[in-house]
């Protein structure tokens, strides 16, 4: 996520534990914040969040966005290696069923 300039100014003026703030919201939605890292580059912070479903994650994004302190965010859904291997097996069984466009 990236903070607005106003949020960055507020954090500099009055430092606060943003991990605790994020954990409070995520816990209220039934999720778990595994870790939060501050970063520099395209984004200001990265959070590793575990949630019961996509609805919970969307609700969290909406709640944070409604606060007005975030200028942009990016979500990457992760899967375990076991789930990825199961997907590979499924793809192997289905790959012949797909006919790419030709022309």
Regions found by a protein language model. Give the residues of each.
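Short S/T/G/P-rich N-terminal loop/turn motif that feeds into the first structured element of a domain
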Residues: 1-27, 32, 43, 55, ...
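Short, well-ordered beta-strand segments in beta-rich or mixed alpha/beta enzyme
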Residues: 1-2, 37-61
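Flexible, active-site-adjacent loop/turn segments at secondary-structure boundaries
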Residues: 9-10, 38, 76
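Surface-exposed beta-strand edges and their flanking turn/coil or helix-capping segments
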Residues: 12-14, 48-49, 60-62, 75, ...
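A short linear hydrophobic-aromatic micro-motif
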Residues: 30-37, 72-74
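An amphipathic, aromatic/His-enriched active-site/gating alpha helix that lines ligand/cofactor pockets
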Residues: 51-79
């Amino acid at each position: 996520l990236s903070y607005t300039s106003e949020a960055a100014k507020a954090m500099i003026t009055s430092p606060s534990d943003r991990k605790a703030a994020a954990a409070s919201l995520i816990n209220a939605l039934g999720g778990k914040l595994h870790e939060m890292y501050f970063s520099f580059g395209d984004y200001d912070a990265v959070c590793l969040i575990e949630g019961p479903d996509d609805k919970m994650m969307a609700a969290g994004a909406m709640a944070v966005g409604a606060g007005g302190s975030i200028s942009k965010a990016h979500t990457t859904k992760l899967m375990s290696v076991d789930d990825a291997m199961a997907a590979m097996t499924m793809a192997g069984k289905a790959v012949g069923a797909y006919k790419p466009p030709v022309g």
